[in-house]
Amino acid sequence: MTVRDWDLRHFRLLDALAEAGSIGAAARLLGLAQPNASRLLDSMERSAGFALAERSARGSRLTDRGLVVAGLASEVLAAATRVTHAVDALAGQGGSLHICSSLTVAEHLMPAWLATARQRLPALSITLDVGNSASVFERLREGSVDLGFVEGPTIETGFHYLDLLRDDLLVVVPAAHPWAARETVGADEVASATLVVREAGSGTRQVAERALAAHTAESAAPSRLEVGSNAALVASVAAGLGPGVVSRMAVSPELLTGRLVAVTVPGLVLARTLRAVWPSRVPLSRETGEFLALVRSLIDG
């Protein structure tokens, strides 16, 4: 292989290595196994005839020559994106946008956003996949989606974020539960209870566990009932399987009918920020920018 055989995979690796600072972190950004990324870098160095990165026990970093090549690689990637947009425009297409959204956003906000997008951006083709916050980051890293929406506290490197709105989580119980008749419930009581929670990787679960950790004894290992969706969580709480922690948006119908009751827990902070997220290594596409502008206009009223 010669340098003339390099393709976008090679340029993406250099761009990610410049951003992440190590071959392992660059591999994670690209959704590659580290050995595969290392082999790709080795083949690039052989074809270039000089070292692109310095290896050490602390990781890998680009050499001075590597930084020059990485800067040019970034320009190539930006040009490739512009070519894609130009071809779409010349073909008279409105473009496409592939979104992966966490459950709360997908179930309670995305339908209105998509309906408005159909009216205001009729030529834009949108595909929506749904998962938890961890899977959103995974899909973005592997490059299979353009834009994500997450609801957890985790801020991962290699991404741009746009804060959208605040979402409050509530501790809820059935109307017949003893806590429903109390003015307040202690945070330590909630932390030690058998709670119905979302699965690991869910933003709802992350926020709940972080908030409850400060009120949980070090030796304690409270039991949890894990469910894979907001609807399953609400139904499990209503069936008496235990108190639950869930977004206000997901449980508002049950609160209005009195089927479930929100419990006041002084000192337990369960607020979170819903965010849009996209890879920092990829220029923001016209389609992504248009959809984000639409979302902001709907939120800001």
Range-by-range predicted roles:
Residues W179, T194-T216, L284-A293:
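Secondary-structure junction motif
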Residues N132-F137, R141-V145, V150-E151, G201, ...:
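Hydrophobic hinge/microswitch elements
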Residues L109, V261-G301:
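A late-sequence structural motif
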Residues F159-V196, A200, R286:
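Flexible hinge/capping segments at coil-to-helix
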Residues D15-A33, G59:
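Short helix-boundary/capping micro-motifs
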Residues S43-D64:
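A short LG(V/I)-centered, amphipathic sequence patch enriched
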Residues S47-A48, V69-A91:
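Alpha-helical linker/hinge and terminal dimerization helices associated
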